[in-house]
Amino acid sequence: MKNFLKKNSSNFFYFLAYLKVKFKSFNGKFQYTFFKQLNLFSKQSIFKNKINQKILFFSARQDKPQLVFNKIIDFALQVRGNETLTIGCDGDIRKSCNYGASPKIDYFSCKECKEFSSKTHSISKSNIYWLSELYNTNDLIESQKIISQFDDKDLPSVFYKGYHIGEFVRVSINHFLKVNKIDLEDNNTVKIYRDFLQASVRQINSFDKFLEKHKPDKVFMLNGLFAAERMMFEVARSKNIHVITYEIGYRPETFFLWHNNPINMCCNDYWNEFKNIKLSDIQNNKLDKYIDERYQGKGLILNYFPNMQKDISLISKKFNIDFNKKTFLLFPNLTWDSTLYNIDLFFNSHSNWIVETIEYFINRPQDQLIIRCHPS
């Protein structure tokens, strides 16, 4: 029922989700466990005097798991004597939010997000600043005026105050439109591109002022490639402020963390340090268990394969697979995944790679191509 509603009546689905968050925010008996834990923790006198560093949490994307993770790190830093402050989204970037899809994020989805985050920061007594509070009407007018000067075809080349914002927003627009290539002949695409660029101009100005005023020692954020985070990342880097980016890992309760770069989940920089180190028996057992879990379709954050077919004979019959032929496998990603950013090296695009590969094998009846689609 949940998936049916979300697919066929998204407005009503997100309205119900918003009501659920509203109810569980204020009703003590049915309140989220996370809120109850926050209440208990916030009342304890375990926070030291703020004598160490000042850490800024940039939380433009604040779905529940990200917000919970941020708050755990936030409290851990405060316990160790650090001062923390947070920039959160109060709906300011609804037209350019990566949790939305063309033409903009659903109204009640945005309201649900704001409700949960505002309650979280209220209970935990966060030092919170909302995005819309960081600029005024004049900033909004200026951003519209600046971006309106550019022709549609020139949007990818837009620079503002030395920042290549036309490039920085590309990952977000691909994700927002669920495309691999941005079509500047399409009116809706151009409108969305301009929305992201206008938001970027406002953010660069407001983030610059904020960092100058508060002077954090470090900035902690999700990913670092998507639009709002990318603007904060670049402005902070221009001021030599240390930035830590993170992403949820492939296994449950694991994370990737990166320093002074947008997240890179395919990094081999440290391989030379570990390649000659022999695994212990415990590590070998853990690795064997993990490989077995993956073989069974488990060991992931989401259960992509609740009803996985394991009978090879049935699979081969269904898809006409002939094991006497030489077999080639293709593993495409989602075409708008941020991990594909700037790695179109040998083909014009991710989609072009798939199409050309299929066309090649059409003319090779002695071989067969199996395409394993991304489970998302």
Give residue spans per PLM region.
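Short hydrophobic beta-strand segments
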Residues: 49-63, 217-220, 328-332
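A short, glycine/small-residue-rich beta-strand->loop->alpha-helix junction that serves as a flexible
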Residues: 59-69, 221, 338-344
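Conserved N-terminal ligand/cofactor-binding loop architecture of enzyme catalytic domains
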Residues: 1-58, 76-201, 248-308
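Conserved catalytic-core segment of nucleotide-activated headgroup transferases in glycan assembly
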Residues: 296-376
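Conserved nucleotide-sugar donor-interacting segment of glycosyltransferase catalytic cores
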Residues: 203-258
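Histidine-anchored nucleotide/phosphate-binding helix
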Residues: 64-86, 90, 233, 349-362
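Short, solvent-exposed loop/turn segments at secondary-structure junctions
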Residues: 61-64, 91-94, 224-227, 249-252, ...
